[in-house]
Amino acid sequence: MYHDLIRSELNEAADTLANFLKDDDNINAIQRAAVLLADSFKAGGKVLSCGNGGSHCDAMHFAEELTGRYRENRPGYPAIAISDVSHISCVSNDFGYDYIFSRYVEAVGREGDVLLGISTSGNSGNIIKAIEAARAKGMKVITLTGKDGGKMAGSADIEIRVPHFGYADRIQEIHIKVIHILIQLIEKEMVKA
């Protein structure tokens, strides 16, 4: 009944991944991001991650697998997803939604830490403000974006961009693959410590 639709969806997902893989800059950016994160951890730093909607879930998933585990048991790594509901509702009410991540970065971010901002459009105002706050704190910034990078293009130390201009879910599918690879590479780098 839906076999053609199912095949079409899976083929489109495979095509999006294949297009991402064609660009060696994407592979290099993933490697550089993993090394940057591991170097921060080795120096006593942490990563703060943020996103909206599905990207918020990806930010939490990233932090959870760093503090908990990915595939194998190992020590937890210092990662915080900016996802505290009381913080988000307070800042949204008192300052505005654009400040939900930046206020948290201002409060707990330190020089040597890393911000991971995830936005499929690259136009999330609250992540742009978080990047500005991270810069003011002397933090490094990694972004996972899509399409043409939006307003976030060029704002990070390392941008990993999925150049897909269709639905956001295709971009998110690559983002979660990148997140898992980042964790795998971080684990390899931390063994070298």
Curated annotation (Swiss-Prot):
CDD domains tied to this protein: SIS_GmhA
PROSITE patterns registered for this protein in UniProt: SIS (PS51464)
Ribosomal protein is among the record's keywords: no
GO-annotated biological processes: carbohydrate metabolic process; D-glycero-D-manno-heptose 7-phosphate biosynthetic process
Pfam families linked to this entry: SIS_2
A GO CC term attached to the entry: cytoplasm
Cofactor notes: Binds 1 zinc ion per subunit.
Pathway(s) the chain acts in: Carbohydrate biosynthesis; D-glycero-D-manno-heptose 7-phosphate biosynthesis; D-glycero-alpha-D-manno-heptose 7-phosphate and D-glycero-beta-D-manno-heptose 7-phosphate from sedoheptulose 7-phosphate: step 1/1
Binding site for substrate: N52, G53, G54, E65, N93, D94, S119, T120, S121, S124, Q172
InterPro entries in UniProt: GmhA/DiaA, Phosphoheptose_Isoase, SIS_dom, SIS_dom_sf, SIS_GmhA/DiaA_subfam
Cytoplasm as UniProt keyword: yes
Domain SIS: 37-193
Residues given in the record as Zn(2+) binding sites: H61, E65, Q172, H180
SUPFAM superfamilies per the UniProt record, alphabetical: SIS domain
A single MF term (Gene Ontology): D-sedoheptulose 7-phosphate isomerase activity
EC number(s) stated in the UniProt entry for this protein: 5.3.1.28
NCBIfam families listed in its UniProt record: gmhA, PRK00414.1
HAMAP family linked to this entry: GmhA
Function: Catalyzes the isomerization of sedoheptulose 7-phosphate in D-glycero-D-manno-heptose 7-phosphate.
Protein family according to the UniProt entry: Belongs to the SIS family. GmhA subfamily.
Protein's name according to its UniProt entry: Phosphoheptose isomerase
Source organism of this protein record: Yersinia enterocolitica serotype O:8 / biotype 1B (strain NCTC 13174 / 8081)
Record lineage: Bacteria, Pseudomonadati, Pseudomonadota, Gammaproteobacteria, Enterobacterales
Underlying gene: gmhA
